[in-house]
């Protein structure tokens, strides 16, 4: 064997055998000749079939004990009984915990977590909201949480949460934006760097047909 061939072999390069260096998955044979693939982006791949995939996933959770248990296991392991706040504010002097202030903070946090305060609809306590968010991510892939900076239910804290199902994001809202050059992609306005700027939500759930009327196609733009 010549010195050149030895050098090529040591470097892992064999000029006479280029075919053998190709990825096996890219070769055409009787086993792969009917294997049709696409090189579309993630958005293009899911566009047009997102709602169908989401609905099938939800039905699977409703009808299958295995899928339902998998969702329950995710919620139990990620959230459990919910986030517990432990305040550790230090005193200005002495380097010790301010126990009195910490107790007041923890009490205020716990009180805000009541369903009449933390949920704009007054239906879910904060632990239930957490479980719903994680469950929706497991089942539907995503969920939206809108922060409302005003008090609800007589709360002293101007802060509450609104859960918005992913169905309400209008995936058909696609195209160029107005003057700023941003682009709408499946209900999400993104800038030149792909950062989400604004969302186009339907004001009513599209599946709530008996109660939606024409208002279902009116958009609520949130940033």
Per-segment meaning from a language model:
Residues 70-223:
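Structured, mid-chain assembly/scaffold modules that mediate subunit interfaces
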Residues 1-94:
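N-terminal-proximal low-complexity accessory segments that begin disordered
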């Amino acid at each position: 064997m010549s010195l050149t061939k030895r050098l090529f072999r040591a470097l892992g390069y064999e000029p006479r055998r280029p075919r053998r260096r190709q990825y096996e998955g890219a070769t055409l044979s009787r086993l792969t000749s009917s294997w049709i693939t696409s090189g579309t982006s993630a958005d293009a791949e899911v566009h047009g079939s997102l709602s169908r995939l989401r609905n099938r996933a939800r039905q699977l959770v409703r009808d299958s004990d295995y899928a339902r248990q998998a969702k329950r296991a995710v919620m139990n392991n990620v959230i459990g009984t919910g986030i517990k706040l432990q305040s550790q504010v230090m005193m200005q002097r002495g380097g010790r915990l301010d126990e009195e202030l910490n107790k007041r903070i923890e009490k205020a946090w716990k009180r805000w977590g009541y369903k009449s305060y933390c949920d704009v609809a007054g239906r879910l306590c904060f632990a239930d909201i957490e479980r719903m968010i994680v469950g929706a991510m497991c089942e539907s892939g995503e969920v939206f949480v809108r922060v409302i900076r005003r008090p609800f239910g007589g709360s002293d804290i101007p802060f509450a949460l609104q859960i918005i199902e992913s169905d309400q994001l209008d995936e058909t809202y696609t195209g160029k934006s107005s003057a700023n050059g941003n682009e709408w992609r499946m209900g999400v306005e993104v800038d030149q760097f792909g950062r989400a700027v604004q969302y186009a939500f339907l004001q009513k759930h599209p599946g709530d047909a008996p109660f939606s009327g024409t208002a279902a196609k009116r958009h609520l733009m949130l940033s």
